[in-house]
């Protein structure tokens, strides 16, 4: 069926009315009255558990949210994506990152062309190159083995590889991986200064080979290699992830060290492609294929499972409920796993660049809020930084906890138990809170004077009723990581379809790029700032003055 705008509008109205009527409901009472609440509001896919029972929903909520998904034609849009239709309507492109991890022998067609053989060809080339670097068969110009790789990219060419490489640290048995993204010269200077060009491979990740930040850093790295080892050494110390073969050749990188990808792969969905080359070199091709396999398992589940049993769909519906119906403008991602320290930043781009839109697919203003602000830090660090606001602040911010049942350090299992206890304690505390009477009783048990009890007790009250959801898997391994990332990718898709927006373009990134190009000669003093707004003129003048001071 097609998207039913009238039914969608009516269902949203029902949801808003339902929220207004059910919002005062106490979550403690909901759990006390319903022993089966956890069972009804949780789902499993193998060892992966998704629990949303601490969110402020009931059976009516879930029935209306399913009705919403049907009215928005989530299933039809999902089928169109998997079929290779051009669902990115503003760029007239297919959206097929799912094909990058599809190892089946069936066809995946884009404009009548089966793309799976192309995907396999690039993956096999990546694996051969990674094996060569890891084994030492592919050496540097002086004959030394490569000990360090530096990935130069930005946005999707950086955030995914950084996140995955850190997450899979226990599986590293290849060269050390480093990442440079920022145009700030301090980033590349600090990265290169402890390294030896003779044992360093630099990967330049830019589809067009024109990204300003990436190419500026790449030229700095090229000079670093050439100044030490000579111009002839450049080819042996660089590889590229790009489709601009002419520009790559002009840079000095041989064609057999260039790995391409396709316009149906968006940057923030590209870690599964050749953009993941630094991950593959760090953990090996076999582990990288397990990473892809985990994502493919989630793809199959998302494609085939009915709406009410579908993890990405339910995660997306809860996300929509929190943002558009409850009015929560922010979403905190809290992985209780230090190796997932860059996951919040990765999901920040995935979600905010996808769903930070204000017009619908047909170019009309949206009728309500779209994507939330996404942010977070690992637990338990966040508890000692911003959880105060989450527990007692005036804004309600839903939390998404992620934790593994087992860690990678068996001799430190007691610390992992402490980690798990903290994760569960936070979700329980946010839901239950503490009443004024409970705060008084706690203080009275310390034999404090009555006047002190009355003075302090209000400060120790927690409202509770603060929603959180929890994702638990067995262990953070390549398969689990791939599955987790694909879960969030498809969640973004579901929310976008209900919002009625295009999740696969990012025109908001472009204006700043254009103005930065215009302002560079102004900042460097080659042109005047006349014609700019008074603030920009004042800022330029101050920068010029301070640079001369």
UniProtKB/Swiss-Prot annotation:
One Gene Ontology cellular component annotation held by this UniProt entry: cytosol
UniProt record, GO biological process: gluconeogenesis; glucose 6-phosphate metabolic process; glycolytic process
GO molecular-function terms, A-Z: carbohydrate derivative binding; glucose-6-phosphate isomerase activity; monosaccharide binding
EC number assigned by the record: 5.3.1.9
Catalytic reaction(s) noted: alpha-D-glucose 6-phosphate = beta-D-fructose 6-phosphate
Pathway: Carbohydrate biosynthesis; gluconeogenesis; Carbohydrate degradation; glycolysis; D-glyceraldehyde 3-phosphate and glycerone phosphate from D-glucose: step 2/4
Protein's job: Catalyzes the reversible isomerization of glucose-6-phosphate to fructose-6-phosphate.
UniProt-recorded name of the protein: Glucose-6-phosphate isomerase
Native organism: Brucella ovis (strain ATCC 25840 / 63/290 / NCTC 10512)
Gene from which the chain derives: pgi
